[in-house]
């Protein structure tokens, strides 16, 4: 029961919403270089389940780790933190 609370939660930007019920989320974070100690920015893309197709390109979203939903989907959409502004 405690492992359900240990699931990873990330905040990232939607970079693709072309698939049905699936979005691609880019999560940026920092790592410290082992030798020099400088913080280096790196990013990773996660395929995420979006049941209602509610997230759009450019939105900032919160995603949570879940059971495998397909060959590549391991996360689900929790909430849309900030909607993108289309000019």
UniProtKB/Swiss-Prot annotation:
The keyword Ribosomal protein applies. Coiled coil: none annotated. InterPro entries: NA-bd_OB-fold, Ribosomal_uS17, Ribosomal_uS17_bact/chlr, Ribosomal_uS17_CS. Transmembrane segments: none annotated. Pfam families: Ribosomal_S17. One of its GO terms (cellular component) is cytosolic small ribosomal subunit. SUPFAM superfamilies: Nucleic acid-binding proteins. It comes from the Bacteria. Keywords: Ribonucleoprotein, Ribosomal protein, RNA-binding, rRNA-binding. One of its GO terms (molecular function) is rRNA binding. PANTHER family: 40S RIBOSOMAL PROTEIN S11 FAMILY MEMBER (PTHR10744), SMALL RIBOSOMAL SUBUNIT PROTEIN US17M (PTHR10744:SF1). One of the primary rRNA binding proteins, it binds specifically to the 5'-end of 16S ribosomal RNA. Belongs to the universal ribosomal protein uS17 family. Part of the 30S ribosomal subunit. This is Small ribosomal subunit protein uS17. It comes from Staphylococcus haemolyticus (strain JCSC1435).
């Amino acid at each position: 029961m405690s492992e359900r609370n240990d699931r990873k939660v990330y905040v990232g930007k939607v970079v693709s919403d072309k698939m049905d019920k699936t979005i691609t989320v880019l999560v940026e974070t920092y790592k410290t270089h082992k030798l020099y100690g400088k913080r280096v920015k790196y990013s990773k893309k996660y395929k995420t389940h979006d049941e209602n197709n509610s997230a759009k390109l450019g939105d900032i979203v919160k995603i949570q780790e879940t059971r495998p939903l397909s060959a590549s989907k391991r996360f689900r959409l929790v909430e849309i933190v900030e909607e993108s502004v289309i000019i």
